[in-house]
Design a protein with these regions (language model features):
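Canonical helix-turn-helix DNA-binding module
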Residues: 56-80, 86
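Basic, amphipathic "hinge/linker" alpha-helix immediately C-terminal to the N-terminal HTH DNA-binding motif
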Residues: 30, 84-107
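Solvent-exposed, amphipathic alpha-helical segments
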Residues: 36, 40, 77-79, 106
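N-terminal leader segment of winged-helix/HTH proteins
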Residues: 1-29
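C-terminal regulatory/oligomerization modules of transcriptional regulators
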Residues: 1-6, 104-172
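Short histidine
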Residues: 6-9, 15-16, 33-38, 48-49, ...
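N-terminal helix-turn-helix DNA-binding core of bacterial DNA-binding proteins
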Residues: 20-61
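Short amphipathic alpha-helical interaction/hinge segments
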Residues: 49, 76, 115-119
Length: 172
């Protein structure tokens, strides 16, 4: 019976409800935890299961986190690097998830305008909103260097990632 349910679940996960691009996106990351996991990898530089679990502001349960990580890898939004026996597996963003930076910025800005937030947790959204597309492009280039191994952008000032981290720490 379990094997039959697993096969049915796999089939459902592979079949889209429709050919609508918004539906396709929602099916990839539209549940209540996937965007938060991606946020923590993207903005918190949490790359390991324990870091994601311990650093979750929303207190994600370990079984939910494990499930979402598997789904995000399956959807092509994260990669999982197996480090070998006794070592931790590292998760990395893919190009597809890095291209979600503008979506995160817009979601954050919407949340700032329409939902109550706390100072500490709103600081990154404020910076992304204020910086707009030029800042997003810089951040995406930095994320590509970290997660995809592309050449790091040349710097004469702190990186976007460093500035976001400093602002977050200062607001804490």
């Amino acid at each position: 019976m379990v094997e039959c349910n697993q096969l049915r679940r796999k089939r459902v996960e592979q079949e889209a409800r429709s050919g609508c691009p918004i539906n396709a996106a929602v099916e990839a990351f539209g549940d209540s935890w996937s965007l938060l996991v991606l946020r923590d990898v993207m903005f918190g530089n949490r790359r390991y299961f324990r870091e994601l679990l311990a650093g979750s502001e929303e207190r994600i349960a370990s079984n939910i986190l494990a499930d979402r990580l598997k789904r995000l890898v399956s959807a092509g939004l994260l990669t999982r690097e197996d480090a070998g026996p006794g070592r931790r597996a590292a998760y990395s963003l893919t190009e597809a998830s890095i291209q979600l930076v503008p979506v995160f910025a817009q979601l954050g800005e919407w949340g700032l305008r329409h939902r109550p937030t706390t100072k500490r947790l709103r600081v990154r959204a404020e910076m992304l909103a204020a910086g707009g597309p030029p800042l997003w492009a810089e951040l995406m280039a930095e994320l590509r260097a970290i997660h995809l191994g592309t050449a790091a952008p040349e710097r004469t000032s702190p990186s976007v990632i460093e500035r976001l981290a400093e602002a977050y720490a200062a607001a804490s």
